[in-house]
């Protein structure tokens, strides 16, 4: 969102304000019951004098990226890195500016079936339904990876059906039999009656899998604001590593209370880390190679078609340069 100056009709993107910043308001998307690195950065004072402007809920990575590219928000929601690779491959003018999350040995997340389900392997999923929040993102990639590693051929993989579920309904869909497998976390797992089939960490290990994307147009018009926000996010991620887990969760709970949205904070107590392996959320080519290789394997990309430096930039993450 642009800085509003009464009596001035000039677009804020062309203005220089406090500390050389082009805008003091920054539009973003959030998720109910969750605190993102961007929101923590603001609460810790790392974005000041910039204020976040909440634009609503993100339904998933691709929608979050599209929101940033269209200008509905100034940055994407934390989005699957594979979606960012597809974005660049299709020629869309956007750039990954900082990591948002990664895979790690998380006991509170995975892809689950009912405890008494006959599904015990990838092959058992043939003819079954799998719940997802959105098509073409992380759940779909990890499912296909699991099925391939389980020995399924493309024809068999196509017999596994993805079902798009409304936000927050995965557990209900699984327990009611609407789907046979669903991504679950925290409270849903603790309630029991479910069994983990696989998880992201089992498939890719420690890897940065989530990112923040910004439109190239916004970056060009707001370089100082971009630098302030991206560096602030990096600082917040490092802060979360350096503090005891219970203190980080307590901070999250305070943030939820202050923002006064209709949301349930039950997931917060299951937070352990954001799982970003690199210091200061810095990216390297290797973070994207797995997704590029997958697109090449599926025939969506040719060898050497992608210049990794067009996917991401650490230029605005000053904290990663320390």
Where do the language-model regions lie?
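Short, low-complexity disordered leader/linker segments with a strong preference
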Residues: 1-24, 320-322
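Short, glycine-/small- and polar/acidic-enriched structural segments
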Residues: 15-155, 159-163, 180-183, 195-196, ...
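Solvent-exposed, polar/charged alpha-helical surfaces in well-ordered, non-transmembrane soluble domains
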Residues: 39, 45, 66, 70, ...
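Short, solvent-exposed loop/beta-turn-alpha elements that line the ligand-binding surface or hinge
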Residues: 49, 103-104, 202-205, 274-284
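Short, hydrophobic secondary-structure boundary micro-motifs
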Residues: 50, 96-98, 248-250, 303-305
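Pocket-lining segment of extracytoplasmic ligand-binding domains
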Residues: 80-82, 163, 168-256
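Secondary-structure end/capping motifs
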Residues: 220-302
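Conserved C-terminal helix/tail region of periplasmic/extracytoplasmic solute-binding proteins
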Residues: 289-322
């Amino acid at each position: 969102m642009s800085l509003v100056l009464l009596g001035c009709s000039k677009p804020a993107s062309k203005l220089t304000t406090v500390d050389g910043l082009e805008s003091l308001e920054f539009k973003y998307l959030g998720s109910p019951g969750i605190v993102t690195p961007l929101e923590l950065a603001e609460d810790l004072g790392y974005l000041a004098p910039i204020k976040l402007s909440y634009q609503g809920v993100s339904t998933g990575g691709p929608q979050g990226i599209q929101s940033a590219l269209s200008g509905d928000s100034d940055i994407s929601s934390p989005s699957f890195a594979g979606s960012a690779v597809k974005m660049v491959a299709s020629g869309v003018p956007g750039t990954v500016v900082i990591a948002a999350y990664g895979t790690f040995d998380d006991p509170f997340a995975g892809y689950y079936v009912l405890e008494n389900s006959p599904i015990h392997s990838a092959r058992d999923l043939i003819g079954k339904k799998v719940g997802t929040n959105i098509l073409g993102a992380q759940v779909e990639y990890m499912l296909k990876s699991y099925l391939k590693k389980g020995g399924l051929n493309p024809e068999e993989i196509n017999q596994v059906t993805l079902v798009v579920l409304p936000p927050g309904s995965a557990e209900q869909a699984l327990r009611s039999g609407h789907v046979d497998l669903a991504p679950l976390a925290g409270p849903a797992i603790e309630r029991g009656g479910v069994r983990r089939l696989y998880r992201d960490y089992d498939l890719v290990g420690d890897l940065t899998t989530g990112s923040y994307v910004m439109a190239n147009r916004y970056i060009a018009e707001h370089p100082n604001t971009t630098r302030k926000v991206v560096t602030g996010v990096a600082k917040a991620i490092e802060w979360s590593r350096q503090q005891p887990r219970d203190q980080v969760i307590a901070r999250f709970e305070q943030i939820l209370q202050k923002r006064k949205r209709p949301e349930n904070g039950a997931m917060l107590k299951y937070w352990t880390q954001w799982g970003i392996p690199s210091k200061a959320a810095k990216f390297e080519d290797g973070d994207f190679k797995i997704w590029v290789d997958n697109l090449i394997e599926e025939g969506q990309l040719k060898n050497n078609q992608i210049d990794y430096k067009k996917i991401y930039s650490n230029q605005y993450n000053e904290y990663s340069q320390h």
